[in-house]
Swiss-Prot record:
The record marks 8, 223 as: Transition state stabilizer. Substrate binds at residues 40-41, 62, 157. It catalyses: N-acetyl-L-glutamate + ATP = N-acetyl-L-glutamyl 5-phosphate + ADP. Gene3D superfamilies: Acetylglutamate kinase-like. Its main location: cytoplasm. GO terms for biological process: arginine biosynthetic process via ornithine; L-arginine biosynthetic process. The lineage of its organism: Bacteria, Pseudomonadati, Bacteroidota, Bacteroidia, Bacteroidales. This is Acetylglutamate kinase. Its EC number is 2.7.2.8.
Amino acid sequence: MEKLVLIKVGGKIVEEEETLRQLLNDFAAIEGYKVLVHGGGRSATKLAAQLGIESKMVNGRRITDAETLKVVTMVYGGLVNKNIVAGLQALGVNALGLTGADMNLMRSDKRPVAEVDYGFVGDVKEVNADLLASLIHQGIVPVLAPLTHDKQGHMLNTNADTIAGEAAKALAKHFEVTLMFCFEKKGVLLDENDDESVIPEIDRIAFKGYVEQGIIQGGMIPKLENAYQAIDAGVKQVIITQASEIHQGKGTRVF
């Protein structure tokens, strides 16, 4: 089976000119089939403030009301996505920017109201893996924004880690997939204050122990839970690493 690397990047990596330039150079240097998934929450918060729209967060997750949905659609599907595509094209990478609405690539259901009403947020229900694989086999490099649709005419804000995980699981039917989650740290850390304390490998037993000890906490827990869901669905391996090391295989390998 042919190999494919799917990389998810977020935070300041895609929103600061110098870090984005370095990321795109490193991504362009990866040989073979590849997909890039990006976030953009900081840019969305900044634009919302400029427009006088309050950004509401609960447990680190954005509440997406009707006005906020307009902002994230503009920022994720427009500003951030097209800056990445333009940068990759300049490096000779035939990138194509997509949201889940394009060609019905990714359909979601609006998240039901529970303890918190997250608004226009989507939980992915269907990925058009055949279409995505067809684009990839044509030499196109998909750049996926964290937006889906409900096929009823509505866009939905969708977590970028979820987009990456669902795309990787769907593509595992067509490729041997390596899924990489990239952020500012070098990997999963034993000590959050020591950037060199990278845990090289984590299996399920170790993960459970680290959570119980409070070593792994916060946003890293759902990231690792997504990783194990991807592995269960056929993804070959998951790596959590720093964006500057995506072509070196460093970081934390999850298995």
